[in-house]
Amino acid sequence: QYLIESHRSIGVKYETKLNSHKIDIQLREQSFKINSKLIIRPWLFQFLVGDTPKYLSYLRLGDILVVGTPSDFSGELVDPIEKSISNKSLNLMINSFNGGYIGYVTDDKWYDRDDINTYETYTMNWYGPYNGKYFSELIKKIIEINEKH
């Protein structure tokens, strides 16, 4: 009886953080590489493929942070991003295909290499080099914003 009454006197506090946002992003003009010498011009790419929404989105629910990208986002980029998190209780999930599609986003070191001109790192990198670093930095900024709140 005493244990039950003592238990009821313990203060309980629940706190749930809930936040979401959509952030428009800027990218260079898109193109499609057929090979290292033949690249479809941006205006023709636009005519053939059309335009797509370009934004990052995030949802914060408690200690879970879900970041959506408009790409096929390389898992190789996730580990360095996770290591940048100072709040170790924050659980990060990065998702691809958040409503738009801009092609593959891979580590910049793989872009335009002659020895590995693969589908993912060459043909499907529609917006050119440096997007691996660019997206990683944007996601780190989203993490910083959410670590403060």
Go through the PLM ranges and name each one:
Residues 1-149:
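Non-catalytic substrate/cofactor recognition surfaces at enzyme active-site rims
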